From Swiss-Prot:
It is found in: Cytoplasm. Belongs to the peptidase T1B family. HslV subfamily. This is ATP-dependent protease subunit HslV. The gene is hslV. Its EC number is 3.4.25.2.
Amino acid sequence: MSDNLALHGTTILCLKKNEEIIIAADGQVSHGNTVLKSTARKLRTIANNKIIAGFAGSTADGLALFEKLEVKIEQHKHNLLRSAVELAKDWRNDKYLRRLEAMMIVGDRSHILILTGNGDVVEPENNVAAIGSGGLFALSAARALMSYENNLTAEEIALKSMNIAADLCVFSNHNIIMEKVV
């Protein structure tokens, strides 16, 4: 990709509050400083809605990673942590996969994980993770709301946090899509 902005031009947020796990994404697809689409779907549910995933980066690369993750999840009997580690190893070592320009967040009832092409599988603290150009805005808002707004649900926190990120990040929009683990 010739433009580093295209790699990070989105916001993906995943959080767990009580027993509710939710992932949210904005709908904007940008290339450089141009908005190409405002209603993109960057999320997927896997394993009969037991696992949720979202990507930031190249669309084709993100979709390829979704497919690879689904295969790993089937191979490892829906064990998300093992599947994520195996995907990260392949992503880092495979000549083709190594060139993929994307990041992922995946989650289930036990884990929220960030996966990168460097082979990283990071389980963030505080049950909240975010990636993309608006990720730090969404992460900050979600952590603050989780600390001080005990009456909000995970879905309400995700929506408020994503809207704050969309207000601040020009590469994210207010067309928020969410998925839950069931």
